[in-house]
Amino acid sequence: MNYLEIAGALIGLLYLWFEYRASIWLWPVSVIMPAIYIVVYYQVGLYADSVISIYYLLAGIYGWWMWLRHTPDKGEKPVSGTPSKLLLPMFVVLLVVFVLIGILLKTYTDSTVPWWDSLTTSLSIIAMWMLAHKYVEQWLVWLVVDIVSCGIYIYKDLYFTSFLYGLYTVIAFFGYLKWKQLMNLSYERV
């Protein structure tokens, strides 16, 4: 039994609760959780997931800063939709990162799931950036990441983590609905 994995999964549940509520407290937790998973993923040969956890840790600091940088007179950054002008650049970044990571994993590691690992990693980079900007559609990207990750983690015998990502899948659906509602409320106030 991997106690580090269990600790990471429990902290992940706390993170999920804060993210669902659009609470700024998701960010400190999003620094602790990936620090644990850097080790967990490396131990089972999910190298891209281990590296993406470093990104999550840094993105947690960035997201925290992004959410805090609004002045008191402006209030908290509102939930909004992803601007359409960003869709093509996001897709290009996704594609380039997916191919590069996939090639690196296939060529230089013993990963048994290089392309799946690359897919979840590249989608996660996009989703985390969208979360830092409070774009509601980040939940849809996480939905795909969570479904694919569930299968990967079962395959790798990370059952607690797979269970966590199963919960993430359900919460991603409801999180999208909740944030959509928050976005509509912020538009009504304007």
Region locations from a protein language model:
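Membrane-embedded alpha-helical segments in integral membrane proteins
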Residues: M33-V44, V96-I103
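Core catalytic region of metal-dependent phosphoesterases/phosphodiesterases
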Residues: P28-V31
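Helix-loop junctions on the outward
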Residues: A22-W25, Y37-I52
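Short, flexible micro-motifs
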Residues: Y15, A48, G63-M66, F160
